[in-house]
């Protein structure tokens, strides 16, 4: 392996800008900002969305009405000779 060609892999704190929660992980990303986490200083990376604030992980996700969209489509194009599977 060649020496000094790999990026520096080190502990980094990821900060959720929405909730303020901090996550300690390892990364090659660089930052000039630092923060204290569990008594030690780490580089900090600010994130807009993390698992702490993303709707999928928080359970607050919005579901679309797929059935309503299909019914609307069928009503709109009913006169063009297409048949529903229910009519068979």
UniProtKB/Swiss-Prot annotation:
It comes from the Bacteria. Disulfide bonds: none annotated. GO terms for cellular component: ribonucleoprotein complex; ribosome. Keywords: Ribonucleoprotein, Ribosomal protein. Signal peptide: none annotated. GO terms for molecular function: structural constituent of ribosome. NCBIfam families: L31, PRK01678.1. Part of the 50S ribosomal subunit. Belongs to the bacterial ribosomal protein bL31 family. Type B subfamily. This is Large ribosomal subunit protein bL31B.
């Amino acid at each position: 392996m060649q020496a000094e060609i790999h990026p520096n892999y080190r502990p980094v704190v990821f900060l959720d800008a929405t909730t303020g929660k901090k996550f300690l992980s390892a990364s090659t990303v660089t930052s000039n900002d630092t923060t204290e986490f569990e008594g030690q200083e780490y580089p900090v990376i600010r994130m807009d969305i993390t698992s702490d604030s993303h709707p999928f992980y928080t359970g607050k996700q919005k579901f679309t009405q797929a059935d309503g969209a299909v019914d609307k489509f069928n009503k709109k194009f009913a006169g063009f000779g297409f048949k529903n599977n229910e009519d068979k």
